[in-house]
Design a protein with these regions (language model features):
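An active-site-proximal "capping" alpha-helix that borders the catalytic cofactor pocket
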Residues: 12, 49-62
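Divalent metal-dependent phosphate-bond-processing catalytic cores, especially two-metal-ion Mg2+/Mn2+ enzymes
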Residues: 1-10, 14-24, 37, 87-169
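Hydrophobic, well-structured mid-protein blocks that either form specific transmembrane helices
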Residues: 59-99
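Short amphipathic alpha-helical interaction patches enriched in hydrophobic/aromatic residues
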Residues: 20, 39-44, 59, 63, ...
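His-Asp-centered metal-binding catalytic motifs of divalent-metal-dependent phosphohydrolases/nucleases
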Residues: 28-46, 73-82
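Conserved strand-to-helix beginnings and helix N-cap segments that scaffold or border functional pockets
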Residues: 45-49, 109-110
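Membrane-helix interface segments
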Residues: 26-28, 68
Length: 169
């Protein structure tokens, strides 16, 4: 398990719906569908192009209109942190809500557990032992091999400052 299981999807969807209500979002349908499917085209987990085609076919099969499908796919494709690159992509309120909900599930106790689960899934160590004289500063940690602890510095410790909605903040 990578930490992207059905329990994660359920938490993200529940959080997104709560945020949507508090933010008075009008398109709850987009928030709910994008939340439920938010990891289906994540390049960490699948081949993105093939997954996007399957996702689009599925969304048409449940009789969504083209504009709604395009919005859902845009949100899902630009949701992931991706080394901070997706933070430059402007999302609709619906997209901001789903992104915030996903990020909220990556911090706190659940986020800590998921970070170690993710590292284990990808055969990354908890931490790579270093001589005391070589322990990096937070700015230098990205030069070290991937590990669960490095993931905190690469991403998790930055998320609280990247929330879009007032409710998530």
């Amino acid at each position: 398990y990578s930490g992207h299981d059905i329990a994660h999807v359920e938490r993200v969807t529940s959080l997104a719906l709560k945020i949507a209500k508090a933010e008075q979002c009008q398109r709850i349908d987009i928030v709910e569908i994008a939340s439920l499917l938010h990891d289906t085209v994540d390049s960490k987990l699948t081949t993105s192009d093939a997954a996007t085609i399957k996702l689009e076919k599925f969304l048409y099969s449940i009789n969504l209109d083209t504009l709604t499908i395009n919005e859902i796919i845009f949100i899902i494709k630009h949701l992931s942190y991706r080394n901070g690159e997706n933070n430059q992509i402007s999302l609709s309120l619906e997209g901001q809500i789903v992104r915030d909900a996903d990020r909220l599930d990556a911090i706190g106790a659940i986020g800590i557990a998921r970070a170690f689960q993710f590292a284990g899934h990808f055969n990354e160590p908890m931490w790579t032992e270093l001589p005391t004289s070589s322990i990096p500063s937070a700015d230098e940690i990205t030069t070290f091999e991937p590990s669960a602890i490095r993931h905190f510095y690469d991403k998790l410790l930055k998320l609280k400052d990247l929330m879009h909605t007032e409710t998530a903040r």
